[in-house]
């Protein structure tokens, strides 16, 4: 009696890879959507421009997804700046910035920044007043608190994504 061995390993591997790619697109797409919903709570152009830039990519060869935002300010929104930066890693004190009159929506930062100097509150108010007297749209700040739109999305979706993975791969 002879036994015939049929090798279906290629088909099994292809089915697993296809399921993995579909799962990665679904999970990463959910992360982008939830991050954007988290930014809906925030007001102003600063957050609106960031919301329009969240995206994901799936590397089908590595079977991995990357979710991110190419705008530098997305890092500041996530981790905070100045006195409010996560882990105390921000610049201390007050600083002055000037809104860039040449900026257009979606083109990047709408604020001119040249390295800046940290001031006391009173010094920053004086510098701002001088710049405003010169016709510039100057403002002072000591930073912004972290909003954590991405981390909050991850924390909220992690159980759902794990459940989704178990369901998708259980079917195989």
Predicted regions span which residues?
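Short, Lys/Arg-rich flexible segments
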Residues: 1-172
């Amino acid at each position: 009696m002879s036994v015939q061995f049929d090798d279906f390993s290629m088909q099994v591997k292809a089915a697993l890879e296809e399921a993995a790619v579909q799962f990665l697109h679904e999970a990463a797409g959910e992360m982008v959507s939830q991050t954007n919903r988290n930014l809906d709570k925030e007001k102003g152009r600063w957050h609106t421009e960031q919301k329009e830039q969240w995206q994901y990519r799936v590397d089908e060869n590595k079977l991995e997804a990357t979710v991110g935002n190419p705008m530098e300010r997305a890092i500041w929104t996530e981790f905070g700046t100045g006195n409010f930066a996560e882990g105390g890693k921000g610049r201390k004190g007050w600083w002055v910035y000037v809104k860039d009159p040449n900026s257009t929506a979606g083109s990047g930062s709408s604020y001119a920044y040249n390295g800046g100097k940290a001031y006391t509150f009173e010094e920053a108010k004086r510098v701002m007043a001088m710049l405003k007297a010169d016709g510039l749209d100057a403002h002072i700040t000591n930073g912004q608190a972290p909003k954590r739109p991405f981390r909050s999305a991850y924390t909220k979706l992690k159980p759902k994504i794990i459940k989704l993975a178990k369901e998708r791969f259980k079917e195989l």
